[in-house]
Every structure is written in C-alpha cells, then in structure tokens.
Regions:
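Substrate-binding pocket helix/loop in short-chain dehydrogenase/reductase
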Residues: 62, 110-111, 118-120
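C-terminal helical subdomain
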Residues: 194, 212-301
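Canonical Rossmann dinucleotide-binding motif of NAD(H)/NADP(H)-dependent dehydrogenases/reductases
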Residues: 3-37
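A short, exposed helix-loop element centered on a Lys and neighboring polar residues
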Residues: 134-135, 179
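Active-site helix of classical SDR
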Residues: 21, 134, 170
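Residue(s) in the substrate-gating loop at a strand-loop-helix junction
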Residues: 154
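A glycine-rich helix->loop->beta "capping" turn
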Residues: 6, 65-68, 88-101, 107, ...
Length: 305
C-alpha cells in the first residue's frame, strides 16, 4: 500500500519540545508536513520563564532531516497564547490542517493535600489549553472544510490514579471535549480523536522504573497519533490507547441495565447485580442517543415522578 504523506499540510503540535510532542512533530515532518513546534520551555510543573530553547532544538532536528518547521514558545493556558500559536502557523504557512494538543504539566499530590492552585493550573494547561489552541484552529478548519484534531488524555483520565485527582479530572474532561468536536466538526470534514499514551517523558521519568521507561519510547505512540491526523483516518470521537507497541481502542459504555417502574430503594438493591452486569454493554454516539434509551424505558413502564 502507498505511504501516508502530509505534503501540503500544516500541523501544530503543542508541548513539542520533548517526549511525545517531539516524537509527533518529527514524524509528521518526516512525512512532509510543515510543523509549528510549540513549547513554553518551562519546568514540569509549569513554572519557569518562557523560553524557545526546547522548541528551537526540535526545529533544528527537523530541518537537519530535510523537513520544514518553525518554533513557537507561547503558553497554551491563555486565550492570547492560543491565538498566537495559531497565528504563528498562519503567518508562516497560511493555514492550519492539524492540531495535536499535547502540552501538559504535573502537580501531583494526595487529594487531602491538593491546593486550589494545583487544581486550577492543571486545568488551565490541559483543558483550557486544549480549548485555547483548538478553537481558533477549528474556525479555520471549518472555513477550509478539512481538519484533524488529536487531544491527549491519559490512563489516569480513563481510570484514575493515586495522587492525581487534578490531572485525572482534567484528562477526563477532554473526552467530552473531543466527542463534541466530533459532532460539530462532522459537517466540515473535521475529525477529532483522543489518544491515551503511556510513554517515557519528563512527566513520567520519576513515576516508572528505568527498565519500563526504556520499553515505553514515545516513538512507539506517534504512529498512532499521526495516523489519526491523516486524510486516510475516517473515524472521529474515538479514544485510542498506545504504548510499548500496544495499540487499542477504549470507549465509554453502558450496561443493558434493568427497567424498573417507579423504583424504590429496595428495587435498586434487589436488581443491583443486573444493573451492574456489563454483558452486552452499549456504546452511544452522542448524548441524545443515550437519553432515547431512557425515554424508551419510561414508555415501556409508564414510569412517572
């Protein structure tokens, strides 16, 4: 089969100064994309003065390999920063076709020690940061009737993790974000998907043993992300997991449940096994489809408040 190429496409990769973002940017550029390499250059917890040093190094790597890229050091945690990142792409290359929202920080603490600042900063970078960059790019994609968006969740966002109530919550928020982009972008050939990577990076270097990190190279995740950014990708609103050579799909599903007319507390207790049984669980494409299921149950039982 033919090689997947990105000639003529313009991509923005946030948090691309190292780790996953760097790997994504290098792979896109190697396949012909013009890449905006965005990285604030701060510390892992989001502190430190902005610097383009990390982004510049990745741009140098791309150019040395014959690719085309430009560095950007704006922060994603403000609307002005997001607009500026997109303007960097427009000024350099005239359009935006692809956004990989990868920028992230960590401020891990056990829940009882978590501060409001720790909570707010994580949401500012991961959730608002994705919004700040994707929205101005999305407007351009609508005008051009083409776009590919990949936002980055985490297995912590899917399943939770000790000491990461802020991070897990922010990463879960991005699932609903991407699902809505799928619905609103469908008419304009905009595909939005979610990646849940497990990879060695600044964010994981002291979380996993060195032997495990060696097997979890970012380069093993990037082919999945870059495929989702390609014209050949036909799916949208999906969650994919990747790491260590494993690639899978995750989904939010709902059990068949139990239909209970005007249920009492005891009815819930007596049917709890059936309610909780995930055999034959269903996946819904949007919120309305799930509501329809409940309305059908209400019609069958004649339930009332």
């Amino acid at each position: 089969m033919s090689e997947i190429r990105f000639d003529g496409r313009v991509a923005i990769v946030t948090g691309a100064g190292g780790g996953l973002g760097r790997a994504h940017a290098l792979l896109l550029a190697s396949r012909g994309a013009k890449v905006v390499v965005n990285d604030l250059g701060g510390a892992r917890d989001g502190t430190g003065a902005p610097s383009s040093e990390m982004a510049n190094k990745v741009v140098e790597e791309i150019k040395a390999a014959g690719g085309e890229a430009i560095a950007d050091a704006h922060g994603v945690d403000s609307a002005e920063g997001g607009e500026a990142i997109v303007k960097t792409a427009l000024n350099a290359y005239g359009k935006v076709d692809i956004v990989i929202a990868n920028a992230g920080i960590l401020r891990d603490r056990a829940f009882h020690n978590l501060t409001e600042e720790d909570w707010d900063k994580i949401f500012a970078v991961h959730v608002k940061g994705s919004f700040n960059v994707v929205q101005p790019a999305f407007r351009i994609m609508r005008q051009n009737s083409y776009g590919r968006i990949v936002v980055t969740t985490s297995n912590a966002g899917l399943y939770g993790n000790f000491g990461q109530a802020n991070y897990s919550s922010a990463k879960t928020a991005l699932l609903g974000f991407a699902s809505t982009l799928e619905l609103e972008g469908a008419k304009y050939n905009i595909k939005a998907n979610v990646i849940a990577p497990v990879a060695a990076s600044r964010l994981t270097e002291d979380v996993m043993p060195a032997a495990a990190l060696e097997r979890l190279k970012p380069e093993l995740v990037s082919p999945v992300v870059v495929y989702l950014c390609s014209e050949e990708c036909s799916v949208s609103g999906n969650i994919f997991t990747a790491g260590g050579g494993y690639v899978g799909r995750a989904a939010i599903v709902e059990s068949k449940g139990a239909v209970l007319a005007n249920p009492t507390i005891e009815d819930v207790r007596d049917n709890f096994t059936k309610i909780s049984d995930m055999t034959g669980a269903e996946e819904f494409s949007n919120a309305f489809d799930e509501v329809q299921k409940r309305l059908m149950a209400a019609t069958q039982t004649g339930a009332s408040a």
